[in-house]
């Protein structure tokens, strides 16, 4: 087990009480709803206009992020339940149920008489049934596409019966149109679609498209931030930091790059925990209901040894986003590593897996808890599930070999050999590979004797 011991070295502290949740009245009064935003169907459009479907999804996502009533389900989770060529209603119903959405925002874009027609639809999921309704279509010349689709977030919010103040409506409308350049927005939408495909090729394509987007509009704040996210996924942390800082300089009221800087500080080789806390706090100041920033703040406080503060931050995150698997993973870690609370930890990890069956982090954490408790068969099952999702997950392969040493030495040899074959090609695994070879030699010697 490679990670649990490291967590324990943070030190055990007794939690005397959970932090009181001090929430902004406007946010506390709103019940969050899990929504899935999907690209609109553009199968009838020519190739040059296919990007418009992703463009609508991005405009909706940016706009609805400004209100606590909408908890957006990460689109990356859609890949685990299936991604069709076009998002027709049957596919939307299946996927929305698979990711536990309460509502799905989708639709179709067609072209008629030289004009673009956007037909938005809304699916509200209820136990046993789903009800889909069509919203008022938008018809426009292509040149007005960016301005008109920016109307959709408010249209959906009102259809979902979300009460909006004038200030909230203005924020949503402004965020829904992140650039005045249609060409920059097209490149941005294409870049986001490439990033969502994942993999090295998809991310490199996304970086190229997003770089062109901010060349077209140097003041495209969301473009700078998104390019930073892609660089971070490509392990280019310095390039990522440069883009995040550029975004904060262009618009100091945009919270996402501050949260992203917090993530970079937290993962830095040096212990930049204070800087991480400061960055997360800034993001929360700008958007008090920013659940992921509360999770990051909890992680930073846990790293500093402030266990009570960490749990308080996680609890706040759950208020704003009760369906975020990452929060439950963080609670699972801290409950066991810092408090020794086995049942609470297992419950938290299982809740994360219930919300996202492909959550590698949750299954790794649960496997490590089982392993530490001597529940080796259960641990093996979790590590194998991780490898099913990611066949090159060296941490799961290493842990699996260790556990098999307890129950089946011959199988442990097989697992060590598989781990060494893969990990020996990775510079970051060098020290672990050396340890693995020692285990392998010892096992072979014991079995031979």
Cite the ranges covered by each PLM segment.
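Structural signature of tandem alpha-helical TPR/SEL1-like repeats
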Residues: 201-208, 233-246, 267-282, 303-316, ...
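Helix-start (N-cap) detector for alpha-helical repeat units in TPR-like alpha-solenoids
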Residues: 184, 221-222, 255-256, 291-292, ...
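Terminal, low-structured helical/coil segments at or just beyond the last alpha-helical repeat
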Residues: 406, 413-449
């Amino acid at each position: 087990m490679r990670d649990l011991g490291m967590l324990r070295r943070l030190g055990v502290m007794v939690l005397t009480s959970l932090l009181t949740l001090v929430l902004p009245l406007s946010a506390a009064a709103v019940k969050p709803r899990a929504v899935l935003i999907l690209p609109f169907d553009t199968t009838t459009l020519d190739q040059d206009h296919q990007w418009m479907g992703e463009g609508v999804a991005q405009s909706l996502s940016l706009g609805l992020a400004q209100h606590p009533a909408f908890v957006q389900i990460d689109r990356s989770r859609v890949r685990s339940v299936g991604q069709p060529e076009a998002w027709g209603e049957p596919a939307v119903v299946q996927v929305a149920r698979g990711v536990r959405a309460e509502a799905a925002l989708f639709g179709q874009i067609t072209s008629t008489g030289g004009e673009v027609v956007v037909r938005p639809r809304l699916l509200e999921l209820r136990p046993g049934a789903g009800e889909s309704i069509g919203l008022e279509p938008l018809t426009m010349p292509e040149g007005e596409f960016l301005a008109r689709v920016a109307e959709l977030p408010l249209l959906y919010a009102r259809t979902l019966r979300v009460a909006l103040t004038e200030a909230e409506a203005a924020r949503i409308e402004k965020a829904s149109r992140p650039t005045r350049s249609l060409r920059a927005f097209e490149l941005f939408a294409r870049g986001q679609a490439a990033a969502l495909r994942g993999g090295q090729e998809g991310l490199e394509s996304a970086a190229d498209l997003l770089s062109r987007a901010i060349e077209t509009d140097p003041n495209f704040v969301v473009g700078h931030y998104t390019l930073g996210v892609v660089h971070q996924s490509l392990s280019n942390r310095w390039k990522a930091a440069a883009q995040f800082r550029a975004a904060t300089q262009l618009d100091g009221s945009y919270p996402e790059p501050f949260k992203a800087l917090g993530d970079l500080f937290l993962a830095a080789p040096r212990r930049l925990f204070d800087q991480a806390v400061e960055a997360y706090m800034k993001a929360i100041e700008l958007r008090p209901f920013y659940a992921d920033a509360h999770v990051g703040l909890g992680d930073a406080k846990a790293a500093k040894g402030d266990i009570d503060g960490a749990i308080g931050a996680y609890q706040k995150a759950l208020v704003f986003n009760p369906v975020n698997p990452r929060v439950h993973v963080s609670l699972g870690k801290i409950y066991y590593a810092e408090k020794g609370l086995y049942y609470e930890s297992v419950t938290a990890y299982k809740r994360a897996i219930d919300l996202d069956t492909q959550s590698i982090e949750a299954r790794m954490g649960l496997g490590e808890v089982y392993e530490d408790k001597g529940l080796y068969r259960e641990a093996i099952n979790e590590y194998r599930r991780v490898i099913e999702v990611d066949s090159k997950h060296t941490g799961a392969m290493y842990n699996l070999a260790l556990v098999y040493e307890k129950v089946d030495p011959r199988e442990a040899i097989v697992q060590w050999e598989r781990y060494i074959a893969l990990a020996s090609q990775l510079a970051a695994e060098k020290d672990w590979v050396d340890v693995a070879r020692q285990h392998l030699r010892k096992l072979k010697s014991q079995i031979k004797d």
